[in-house]
Amino acid sequence: MQDLKIKCVADSKCMLGEGPVWDEINQDLYWVDILGNKIFRYDLSSKTVDWWETPEHVGFIVLKKGGGLIAGLRTGLHQLELQSNNKVSGRRIDRVDENTDHIRFNDGICDSRGRIWGCTMDMNQEAPLGKYYKYNGELSRTEVDKGYVVANGPALSPDGNYLYTVETVGGAALNKGIYISELKDGATVKGKQLFINWNKHSKSTFPDGIISDAEGNLWIGEFGGNVLRCFS
């Protein structure tokens, strides 16, 4: 693997910046400020940054075919349109906060089949209330995993046969670390195992966002360490 150099392209001063999404067609980079309730977009050609306020904490966004975004907000999955006044408009598609004020979407991705995989967390970071959900192309929800205090990711292997999930803080149910599960027929999760025990790697930092590259390497943002880790 060649040496990589990291540089700042947009000093957006986020409270909790996460979830980069690349728009290949328009050559734009999107990301969210979860606690700042904002969506950002960086235009590669003009090197300018635009932003939009969201009505709730925004855990992740994915690009919607035909325009607009699907976003995991605090109370659930929303369809959003970006407006010219730094605001968003839209509607809630699905509610996942279970009628509590301390559950929210924390992270999520769209896979090559157009399915959305999203996860929730306990905002108090105490109880194993976090879950992983899968939405099909019609945005019908299926619960695929549970028992996380702070869930992150997930990531899928390049062949789509394995799902990687993250327990960021750890608790009575799950150790802090990365978990791997088999995806039967690319859909049904089974056989979850601890893949990377983070406490053996670091007791003072936390595994956060995760992605798998074309070679099957796992890239993990290390919260509290200001480091991007690659596991192969």
Placement of each model-derived feature along the sequence:
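A short beta-strand motif characteristic of beta-propeller blades
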Residues: 5-11, 47-53, 91-98, 139-146, ...
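Beta-rich, blade/repeat-based domains predominating
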Residues: 12-26, 55-72, 98-115, 146-165, ...
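Conserved beta-strand positions in repeat-built beta-propeller and related beta-rich domains
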Residues: 24, 29-34, 70-75, 116-126, ...
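A short loop-to-beta-strand structural motif that recurs across blades of beta-propeller domains
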Residues: 38-40, 76-78, 130-133, 177-179, ...
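Flexible "stalk/tail and boundary" regions
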Residues: 44, 82-85, 133-139, 227-232
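Short loop/turn segments immediately following beta-strands, especially the blade-tip
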Residues: 80-86, 180-188
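Hydrophobic alpha-helical segments and helix pairs
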Residues: 87-144
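Glycine/small-residue-rich hydrophobic helix-like segments
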Residues: 186-232
